[in-house]
Regions:
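Short amphipathic, helix-prone segments within low-complexity/disordered or flexible regions
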Residues: 2-5, 12, 20
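Low-acidity, Ser/Thr- and Arg-rich intrinsically disordered low-complexity segments
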Residues: 6-9, 15, 38
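Asp-based, Mg2+/Mn2+-dependent phosphohydrolase catalytic module
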Residues: 24, 44-47, 52-60, 160, ...
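Short polybasic linear motifs
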Residues: 31-34
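N-terminal helical cap/lid subdomain that shapes the substrate entry/recognition surface
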Residues: 56-147
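Short, acidic loop-to-helix structural element flanking the phosphoryl-transfer center
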Residues: 135-161, 200
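Conserved phosphate-coupling serine/threonine residues in phosphotransfer and NTP-handling enzymes
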Residues: 163-165
Length: 269
């Protein structure tokens, strides 16, 4: 019987258990799971009567997005960007129709700044003003996430947060949402710190740091162009969370409407 990736991982863990207790397993790396399970059953019968043996379950590696995954993009309050909108919309060098202005304002809550600058062909003045504005931006008041945001603390395994945006602003949002302590590491794909590396760069670092095969890494977020695309490019398990206003993407391997659904998906995997 051929071993799948997950079964190979379990077999490695079983072999480590034997090594810890100075037991030499009879099976080699090509053995089937049936042989391995038979070994450990015999071992536990001999060992368990005299010792306490704890075998820990497989713990997943999960990469979370932040905006529109754990908190709405506009959770900070839309008034915070009004001064910047005034600068951009009063710049005569920007050829923005009323409908484009409306769409641009919406994009600021769901797209990274460099994408917006390119899409709407900002003048040098507006581009410079936008980067300067975001580089100093932060919030000092609590923000609200979704009804299920608190569940991020309930996920077992190694949880990593990778977010796009200016680090000072993003960090203040994460802190004010109260989820900073849920993660082992936080990475910022900061457009204000060129060259922009992209999320795939950080995803690859994470998989290597935690010695996890890409096919065993879970990625959850809302954006097809960002985390879903990055995860797919590395062969990771991509999950699109369909928060209000998020368009369902066929590129994601899985779709959930809430963190509770994602939690159930993990438990069944």
């Amino acid at each position: 019987m051929a071993l799948t990736a997950s079964k190979k991982r379990k077999l490695v863990l079983i072999r480590l258990v034997f090594r810890v207790f100075d037991v030499i397993p009879l099976c080699d790396k090509c053995a089937t799971m049936q042989v391995a399970l038979s070994e450990i059953e015999t071992f536990m019968c001999d060992y368990g009567a005299h010792h306490s043996l704890v075998i820990y379950p497989y713990m997943p590696l999960i990469i979370f997005d932040f905006d529109n995954c754990l908190a709405p993009g506009n959770s900070v309050g839309e008034d915070i960007l009004l001064p910047l909108f005034d600068v951009i919309e009063s710049d005569k060098s920007n050829d923005l129709t009323p409908s484009m202005r409306q769409e641009m304002r919406l994009d600021f809550w769901r797209k990274p700044l460099d994408y917006i600058v390119e899409k709407y062909k900002f003048s040098k003045h507006s581009k410079s003003a936008s980067y300067a504005y975001f580089s100093q931006l932060s919030i000092a008041h609590p923000i609200e996430g979704y009804e299920d945001t608190h569940l991020v603390h309930a996920f077992e395994g190694v949880k990593i947060l990778v977010t796009s945006g200016f680090q000072k602003f993003q960090h203040s949002k994460i802190r004010q949402l109260g989820v900073e302590g849920a993660f082992e590491d936080i990475y910022y794909d900061d457009p204000g710190n060129p060259p922009r590396k992209g999320k795939a760069f950080y995803f690859d670092i994470i998989a290597k740091k935690y010695n996890t095969a890409p096919s065993e890494v879970w990625v959850i977020g809302d954006s097809e162009e960002s985390e879903i695309s990055a995860g797919n490019s590395l062969g990771m398990k991509t999950v699109q969370i369909l928060r209000p206003g998020v368009k369902k993407s066929p590129k994601a391997q899985f779709h959930v409407s809430s963190l509770q659904e994602f939690l159930s998906l993990l438990q069944m995997s």
